[in-house]
Amino acid sequence: MSKVAIIDFGSQFTQLLARRIRDLNIYSEIFLPNVAFDLIKGVDAFILSGGPRSVPNSDGIPKIVHDILQFNEKTSIPVLGICYGLQILSNYFESDVVSNCNKEFGKTILNIIKNSKIIENIWESGDQAYVWMSHADSVYNIPRGFEVIAYSVLNNSIAMVANEQRRIYGMQFHPEVYHTPDGINLLANFLDIAGCQKDWTVTSFIDDQQDAIKKQIGNKKVIAALSGGVDSSVAAALTYKAIGDQLHCVFIDNGLLRYNEVEKVKQLFINELKIPVTIVDKSAVFLNRLKSITDPERKRKIIGETFIEIFEEEANKLEGVEFLMQGTIYPDVVESGGSGSIAKESVVIKSHHNVGGLPKTMKFKLVEPLKYLFKDEVRILGRNLGISTEILMRHPFPGPGLAVRIIGEITEEKVKMLQAADDIYINLIKKYELYDVMWQAFVVLLPVKTVGVMGDRRTYGHACVLRAVNSHDGMTAESFPFCMDEETQWKFFKCIQEASNAIINSVNGINRVAYDITSKPPATIEWE
């Protein structure tokens, strides 16, 4: 199987880059810069990512870059540098990189001045092309042995270089983001130059992952952390397919679930997937420990610690349980700044109970079969495992549940209020046939009370916020429905108007409804 090694220097786009390569049916894997070269030299190509590092302000060229380029000198194995990756390549080949010179952020136009294999059948000399830039440092002069393929129109700075003989290419822009329209084709050209075979599929992932699970678990037992969401459902189905009755599924009712969620979980696992599940009601424990807590990070940590503690109690009732299965996926890892590629390079945005919220004293070894998959890849995997579309198309639900949708202090009364409002909103979205065309929708309860008038009487109740977004993979998101056609927009506006009326008339304690139009970035999809 062909394989591409991505050296992650901390770019927030690194996981998206890996995903885009997989879209081309070529397996990609991410490594930290401190990886031993012997572990990765068997790949078909190397990509050096972008990141927050600065060549002029660094302690020199990382050892892994020396190793890769010395290997390239002997073998001509293809190397692609993106943003910081271009800058570190250029510096290696005796070019100057300068800080705070010719900064570019956002959409940029390139002047293509020379043909190259990397742009074949995409652009040619004399063309102009749109790309997405995000850099403060710039390559000042042409690296030794390279030719410039493109300059930026904005400031005539070097935007793309190539050494055709050694098959080394550099791009100051980001081909992996959707805002670079021809980016996927540029990546495809690079992989063609590398001779990569399009032999990675979700089906092959299932087979490989089953073997990996069997090897990791042996004859031990696994306790599974089920949530009823897409991720844990697919993870459980894959793990059960691999080890059968060695998997013991437990669903904890933490009192912070969607309306009627326990019954839906029973229907899903016991009736549809035929996987035995033990349901444990610990809602009082969670709500008691969250009393008076308002900080979102503390909420997540408390939920994570309580979650593991209860699982340890359940595991102690069984003999031979050494592993905990979780439905952790890539965006969880990215935003937590933990595990693998992002551990030492990226900024923590927020912890996830599946990742950053786990206690250091946790007694289990983790089984995370979906850890390197994006949400849409998880859904493809689920279809291949025979899981129904209705289950797979459920909107994402955060591990800490409604705790991160109740801003401020959590009470049982607020939970019931939010459950009712959210159920009304989601059912109306389904009524208007919009559920399957959006990525995620939910209600947030604010710690703000507002004055209203109902039945000629003054009211003083909570405000809530409706949210709906579209996304490819959870890494970025656009507010719904502004990215949709006009008919869908009007349908959604009618939907939220009806939702507002229904929530205010049906849910005691809420007297005002607002709508959140913020994209990700700058916001995250969830409020906390």
UniProtKB/Swiss-Prot annotation:
- Class of enzymatic activity (EC top level): ligase
User: Which is an annotated GO molecular function term of this record?
Assistant: GMP synthase activity
Keyword Nucleotide-binding, does the record have it? Answer: yes
The GMPS ATP-PPase domain covers: 200-394
Where is the catalytic site?
C83, H174, E176
The entry's cellular-component GO terms read: cytosol
Q: Which InterPro entries match?
A: Class_I_gatase-like, GATASE, GMP_synth_C, GMP_synth_GATase, GMP_synthase, GMPS_ATP_PPase_dom, NAD/GMP_synthase, Rossmann-like_a/b/a_fold
Detail which positions bind ATP: S227, G228, G229, V230, D231, S232, S233
What's a Pfam family this protein contains? GATase
What's the EC number here? 6.3.5.2
Q: In which pathway does it act?
A: Purine metabolism; GMP biosynthesis; GMP from XMP (L-Gln route): step 1/1
- Coiled coil where? none
- Which controlled-vocabulary keywords does the entry list? ATP-binding, Glutamine amidotransferase, GMP biosynthesis, Ligase, Nucleotide-binding, Purine biosynthesis
Q: Which reaction does it catalyse?
A: XMP + L-glutamine + ATP + H2O = GMP + L-glutamate + AMP + diphosphate + 2 H(+)
Give the record's subunit note. Homodimer.
Purpose:
Catalyzes the synthesis of GMP from XMP.
The protein's name in its UniProt record: GMP synthase [glutamine-hydrolyzing]
Q: What is the lineage of its organism?
A: Bacteria, Pseudomonadati, Pseudomonadota, Alphaproteobacteria, Rickettsiales
Q: Which gene is transcribed and translated to give this protein?
A: guaA
